[in-house]
Amino acid sequence: MEKITIYQFTDPVCVWCWGNEPVMRAIDYLYGNKVGVEYIMGGLIEEITTLYDLKGSKRQIIERANAIMAEHWLSASERHGMPVNTRHMALFSERYPSSFPQSIAYEAARRIDATAAKRLLRRIREATFVEARRTSQIDVLIELAAEVGINAARFIDEYTTGEAQNDFSQSRTKCRRNGITGFPSYLIKNASTKISLGGYQNISTFHTIIGRLSEGKIKPRRLGPSLANVTDFMRRYQTAYPVEIEVTFGLDRDRTDLMIDELIRGGRLTSEQVGNGRRLAIANAAKAFRATPRTGQNHHEAKQASAKGSATVASHQKVGQ
């Protein structure tokens, strides 16, 4: 059967890309390997001081830009349902005025392990939007990479050689060649046909296009919204947000909340408040910072590598200094 691939033109700190995470996760869960999802980094913010027409010192401009962006995050969150944490939000600073480091980190990870790179992209977004971390900092990026099973030393090497920077430049060129003017944007294609979409999309749009491109041969799994199925979903991804369950199983918000609350009462899920929403986790899940079979690297070792790597990256990093 011919495979369909969805390309998302994106940036790790794009709030509407964060808002489309439930759809991307639903596609992964419902279609499996019949539909691939790939990410092309476009570079949202090269220099925060030029994003808005603001006056004042560089520090004042950045502080105001952070405040404007926080307001935008809240507005977007109210529409797409993924939570954001804007308390003490200071994503950008004089030393870290760009979102390019996060994209370069993705490209560095992709050179090591393409699947782990997608997990890293998810963690960068999560750390940015619900944990309010400054994810352009190399020490933060190293820790996040280690969390998803990427060896910190290899990650630092890939980040600093310049090849990841070149890959990012090529990705930006792909965006321009495809006429991309905003994120997220999508290209859905099979061997002979491609369809472009601009902006935030709902799951029904992708169902329709996948059905059209496959002539009805590729269909999502039909899963009822049972407690067992939701538990299986959570076991697969370990953590999620309520709207991701809502989108995957075609529920309304009230029904979703009822099912989540029942799973929490039954001891199958845990919930923690994050920003203006809550993060769910499968009960008794292992901590995010843990040794992994692939790397054998634990949180302490990752922290040591992070400390050593920060000095190395400081002499190489062209963006965000």
Segments predicted by a language model, with ranges:
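C-terminal cap of thioredoxin/glutaredoxin-like
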Residues: Q8, V13, E21-Y29, R123-Q321
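Short, cysteine/histidine-rich loop/knuckle motifs that typically chelate Zn2+
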Residues: W16
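Extreme N-terminal starter segment of soluble prokaryotic enzymes
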Residues: M1-Y7
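Structural alpha/beta surface segment adjacent to cysteine/selenocysteine redox centers
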Residues: P22-A132, P242
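A generic fold-level signal
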Residues: M1, F100, I180-T181
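Residue-level recognition of the N-termini of beta-strands and the immediately preceding loop/turn
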Residues: I4, V35-V37, P184
